[in-house]
């Protein structure tokens, strides 16, 4: 008698994806973040669903409804902070997942990589709209500043911004539509994540050496299910420490003041995970130039497969490229720090230099170093 999990039309899909999937025998803990992102997404959808049951998307009651969730709803405070800090964990996993892809050359799987970049954009859009919902000072002003950037688009800019706002300023219509989009986008992200996996399973996973591992595969279950479970436990532990001990560590105190369109906060800044892109935006004095740099700072990821000039796939055996990779990581951390600082000397100049270095490393230095390494290895 054949096994049900191998013959049942629905169960066999799950079986081929998570149980009998042939996986390389040498993938390290850096390959854990895919499953962790799946966990984060599920957690965000569930906590978000319970928050949506008590939230009202109206400018007059949005702030009060969040207060009501935290004070009157059973474990409302836990759900709210798990959702807010869950977003931070989501982005930490995302950045590490992308970083692993860059380091080990996973971007050579074109379709998987490009869908991943689209997923990154969608998660950023969802997080931005979610930040607007509590309707605190930073919510309203962050929404105003970021949406107004679209007015830099020639000819249609102003019309586009007013169309997104649903009026002449960020108001009730904006909040309602942001809530609607914030609710629907995670489900679109979940569907795209399945397509991401579909394309990945066409080729099979990459591995740290970057070599073809067809001759040495092991079943996903039990080896990597156990390994992923350890990652899941660590993620939940870190998240719970954050939620239960310092839930506001990564938030902005200004968001505990109800939104007031008549008083501007001294420093308008987005959540920490957008600060690197925000610093790149601010480092260019021209509005349109800044917006283009902001978009290109993420879109540049799609160029990685085209800029890969090395004869080796992974950076594992390429020390010069490794050095540049870690300089790039340090540069991104610097940009994140700059994004949270006021626009004044010396922060502006540091931001400009860090932005130039970011684009230079990706577009020029890494490809040139790859060619040098090819020469050194007589390839």
Swiss-Prot record:
Signal peptide: none annotated. Heme b b562 binds at residues 83, 182. A ubiquinone binds at residue 201. Its cofactor is heme b. Pfam families: Cytochrom_B_C, Cytochrome_B. SUPFAM superfamilies: a domain/subunit of cytochrome bc1 complex (Ubiquinol-cytochrome c reductase), Transmembrane di-heme cytochromes. It comes from the Eukaryota. It is a multi-pass membrane protein. The cytochrome bc1 complex contains 11 subunits: 3 respiratory subunits (MT-CYB, CYC1 and UQCRFS1), 2 core proteins (UQCRC1 and UQCRC2) and 6 low-molecular weight proteins (UQCRH/QCR6, UQCRB/QCR7, UQCRQ/QCR8, UQCR10/QCR9, UQCR11/QCR10 and a cleavage product of UQCRFS1). This cytochrome bc1 complex then forms a dimer. Heme 1 (or BL or b562) is low-potential and absorbs at about 562 nm, and heme 2 (or BH or b566) is high-potential and absorbs at about 566 nm. Component of the ubiquinol-cytochrome c reductase complex (complex III or cytochrome b-c1 complex) that is part of the mitochondrial respiratory chain. The b-c1 complex mediates electron transfer from ubiquinol to cytochrome c. Contributes to the generation of a proton gradient across the mitochondrial membrane that is then used for ATP synthesis. This is Cytochrome b. It comes from Marmota bobak.
């Amino acid at each position: 008698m054949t096994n049900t999990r191998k013959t049942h039309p629905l169960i066999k899909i799950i079986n081929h994806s998570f149980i009998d999937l042939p996986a390389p025998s040498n993938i390290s803990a850096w390959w854990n973040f895919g499953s962790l992102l799946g966990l984060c997404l599920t957690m965000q959808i569930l906590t978000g669903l319970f928050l949506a049951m008590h939230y009202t998307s109206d400018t007059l009651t949005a702030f009060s409804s969040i207060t009501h969730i935290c004070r009157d709803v059973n474990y409302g405070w836990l759900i709210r902070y798990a959702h807010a800090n869950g977003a931070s964990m989501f982005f930490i996993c995302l950045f590490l997942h992308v970083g692993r892809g860059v380091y080990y050359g996973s971007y050579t799987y074109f379709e998987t990589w490009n869908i991943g970049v689209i997923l990154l954009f969608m998660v950023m859009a969802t997080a931005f709209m979610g930040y607007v919902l509590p309707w605190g000072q930073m919510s309203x002003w962050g929404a105003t500043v970021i949406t107004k950037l679209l007015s830099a688009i020639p000819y249609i800019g102003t019309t586009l911004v007013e169309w997104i706002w649903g009026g002449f300023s960020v108001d009730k219509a904006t909040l309602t539509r942001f809530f609607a989009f914030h609710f629907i986008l995670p489900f679109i992200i979940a569907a795209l994540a399945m397509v991401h996996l579909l394309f990945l399973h066409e080729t099979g996973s990459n591995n740290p050496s970057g070599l073809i591992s067809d001759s040495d595969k092991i079943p996903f279950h039990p080896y990597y299910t156990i390994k992923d479970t350890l990652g899941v436990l660590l993620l939940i532990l870190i998240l719970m420490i954050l939620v239960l001990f310092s839930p506001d560590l990564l938030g902005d105190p200004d968001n505990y003041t109800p939104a007031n369109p008549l008083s501007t906060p001294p420093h308008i800044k987005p959540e920490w995970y957008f600060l690197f892109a925000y610093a790149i935006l601010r480092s260019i004095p021209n509005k349109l130039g800044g917006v283009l740099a902001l978009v290109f700072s993420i879109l540049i990821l799609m160029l990685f497969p085209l800029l890969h000039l090395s004869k080796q796939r992974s950076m594992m055996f390429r020390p010069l490229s490794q050095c540049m990779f870690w300089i790039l990581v340090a540069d991104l951390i610097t940009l994140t720090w700059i994004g949270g600082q006021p626009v004044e000397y010396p922060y502006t100049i540091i931001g400009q230099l860090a932005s130039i270095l970011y684009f230079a490393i990706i577009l020029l230095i890494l490809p040139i170093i790859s060619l040098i390494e090819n020469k050194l290895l007589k390839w």
